[in-house]
Amino acid sequence: MIYHEDPQALHIGTLPKHCYFIPFAPGEDSFSARENSSRFELLNGEWDFRYYDSIVDMEDDFTVLPGREKMPVPSNWQLHGHDKPQYTNIAYPIPYDPPYVPDDIPVGVYSRNYSYNPDGMRRILTFEGADSCLYLYINGVFVGYSQVSH
């Protein structure tokens, strides 16, 4: 699947557009910080991470992540010794040839274990800072793709 080269595929397996909200259980103060909700869980912390200079360098089975390291989330890999920040107020330094993306575009693969209590409540996974696109796999199964999720 190469959704990042398909201009029609901005979001795959995502919810329809909606207002941002945090659910609160009955009796909880819905005007307090989102972290106070019993129905909210941050996935911040140390994640397994593997950096690739190019998407073509990735292993076919990227769930193994040989040579992985720990990366704090939230953060960005440019501030942790990989690649360099890409900010410019003039012509962007990446070749522009839609819908094609250069093969040497850097890739970061993040992975972590997560256990949840199957209590019958619906879970919604939200990414508030992925840049520029993300492919989401759960237990090795593709479940979604999104661009510019921040």
Where are these regions (language model features)?
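Accessory beta-strand-rich segments of carbohydrate-active enzymes
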Residues: 3-18, 29-34, 48-52, 82-84, ...
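N-terminal [4Fe-4S]-dependent radical SAM core
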Residues: 97
